[in-house]
Amino acid sequence: MKTTQELKELLYKNKTVADQQPDAIAEANAFCEGYKAFLNAAKTEREAAAYSEQLLKQAGYKPFVPGMALNAGDKVYLINRSKCVLAATIGERSMAEGFHLNIAHIDSPRLDLRPVPLFEKDGLAYFRTHYYGGIRKYQWPTIPLALHGVVCREDGTTVTITIGENDEDPAFTITDLLPHLGREQNQKKLPDAITAENLNVVLGSLPIADADAENRIKLSILGLLNEMYGITERDFVTAEIEIVPAFKARDVGLDRSMIGAYGHDDRVDAYPALMAEIEVQHPAHTTVCILTDKEEVGSDGVTGMNSMYAYHFLQQLCAATGVDSIAAFQASKCLSADVTAAYDPSFSEAFEPDNGTYAGRGVAIYKYTGAGGKSSTSDANAELVSYLTRLMNKNGVVWQIGEMGRLDLGGGGTIAKYVANRDIDTIDIGVPVLAMHSPFEVVSKADVYMAYRTFRAFCADAE
C-alpha cells in the first residue's frame, strides 16, 4: 500500500506560476510591456493587422506571392483585406509532414456605426450604433469612448479616423439614467435596462448660427467632420467606424501582476502567437501564424476563419513546394488560441472550481468548448491533448486545464472547429480572462507569458 505522501503525488496539482517558477515573473513583466504597447496601438482589427505587419517587416518577412520560390528558413507574410495576418516560416522538413499552426483572432466586441448614424434629438447630436459581438449593453454607458475607423469617400479616396485616444482629443460617451429617476429602470431585467436603441454616442450640443435651419446641431457636427476629414453624410454609407473604450492598458493591482485593458479577447493570444512566429528560426515544420477577423460574430465572411482565405494561403504554400495540400493538412497540428473565463471569486456560483481555470496559474487548455452538451465544438482527441501537455512539460510551461464555467449557464465557441473541419488536428488554448467581453478586461501577466512560451515551444518542436 502506498503512503499518504505517495498517494498525494498522484493528484493533479494546479499551482500558480509564482509558486512553480518565481523567476518567470520578472520575465513575464518584461514581455508584457510589449503586449501593452500592442493593445494601445491596436484597438481594431485593421489597426492590429497594420501593427503586426510593421513587426513582421522589421523581422525581415517578405510579402508572399503565389508561385514564389520558398526555401527553408524563408519568412513570408500576407495581409487579407487589411484585417487578417498570415505569417509563415518555412521549415526544414517537407510540408507533407504538416504545418504547426498558431491561430488567434484580432476582432473584439465593440459598437459599430450604423449606415446612417448621425441624428439630432432635443438639443444633442448623436451617432446611432449597432453592437458587434456578445457585449453586455449595460457596461457601455458612462465610460469614455473613442472613434476608430476608415471612410471611403465618394471621390474614391480613403481617410483614417481616430478621435478620443490622445489627451487633447475630445472623448465620447453614452449616457445612462440618473438613479433619482431610475425606479422603473431598476425593475427591469439586466439585459433590458439598457437596450440597443439606448446605445447612442453623444457628439455635441452647439448649433450652427442660422436660427431658421433645421437640425442645427447635426449640421454643426457634420461641418466639423467635413473640415477635419473632408467627409459628407453620404460617406458614412461607405465607412467602417468602430466605437471602442478610450482606456489605455494599465497595470492592475498593487503588485502590478495583472493588466486591465480593452481587447484582451483575443489580442492577449494574438500577440504572443505572433511574437513566437517572428522569433522562430529554421523550424523543423513550417510554422504559420494566422490572426483572423470576425470570430466574435461567427467567423463568417471573407475575413472570417470559416471562409477559405487561410486555407488558400496554406494551399499556395504547398503548391510552391510541390506538396499535396490534403496530405499536409492531415499531418498538421493547430493551436486555436482564444481566451477562456478565469474563475472569479466574486461570482463563484457561475463556476465549477475543480474544472475552472484561474488567473495566475498558467496558460489554459480546453479540450472542448461549446455550450450544453458540447454543441458547436471541436473536441480534441486525447492523443493531441497528450502531445500538447508533454510539449509544455518538456519546455517548462505552467499550464492548467478546465472548462468555461458551470454547465447549462451558457457557453462559448472558438475558431477551432473551422480549422478542424479542414482535417487538421486542433486544440483550444488561451489565457484566462476576468470580466471577459467587458470594456476593461483583466488578465495575469504570468499567464500571458506562459501562452507565449507555449507558442514558442510549438513553433520549434520537431514532433
Features from the language model and the residues they span:
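N-terminal hydrophobic/helix-forming segments and targeting peptides
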Residues: M1-E463
